[in-house]
């Protein structure tokens, strides 16, 4: 009687994981050497990720939960914060997809890359949500700043979370924009 193979093929031991991980790190370093601006992509993604967490940690520590973070800015912003958090994870995964030994992530990335300007759309969506958070924060607190466009005024409130998120989006977008414009920074 033949011994049964387990279904789903979960059985193969992955002995080359450490080697693949090392190769992945070398691959990533090569990617950064090729264009030093590439490091900004992942730094930016981390900033967006931290935008929802650092201010929350700070606020929890000081016992102030309203002002600081995307989760609480403007009352019920948890929805925005969670979306921004998830999208930042997508951005991080996007950057490491080519360098980690997980074919599923690489496959998904390949499919998404077929969508023109997918990365810009992703960053744009994050930007819009952060903008909404900024405006909601402005209206939720008396110290919001009013910015006037002709006769229309709009109140915005700057919180640490929002600043982190904007910095992250700008950092993640910069190399992509330069790339699209064909501007190369670094030793080519």
Put a short name on every predicted segment:
Residues 8-188:
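Compact integral membrane and secretory-pathway proteins
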């Amino acid at each position: 009687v033949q011994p049964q193979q387990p279904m789903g093929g979960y059985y193969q031991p992955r002995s080359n994981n450490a080697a693949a991980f090392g190769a992945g790190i070398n691959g990533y370093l090569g990617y950064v050497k090729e264009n030093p601006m590439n490091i900004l992509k992942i730094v930016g993604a981390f900033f967006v990720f931290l935008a929802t967490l650092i201010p929350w940690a700070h606020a929890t520590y000081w016992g102030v939960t309203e002002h600081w973070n995307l989760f609480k800015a403007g009352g019920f912003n948890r929805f925005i914060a969670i979306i921004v958090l998830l999208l930042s994870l997508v951005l991080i995964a996007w950057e490491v997809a080519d360098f980690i030994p997980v074919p599923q992530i690489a496959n998904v990335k390949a499919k998404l890359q077929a969508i023109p300007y997918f990365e810009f759309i992703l960053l744009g969506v994050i930007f819009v949500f952060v903008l909404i958070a900024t405006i909601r924060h402005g209206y939720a607190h008396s110290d919001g700043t009013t910015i006037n466009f002709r006769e229309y005024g709009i109140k915005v409130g700057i919180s640490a979370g929002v600043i982190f998120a904007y910095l992250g989006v700008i950092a993640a977008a910069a190399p992509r924009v330069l790339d699209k414009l064909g501007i190369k920074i670094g030793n080519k």
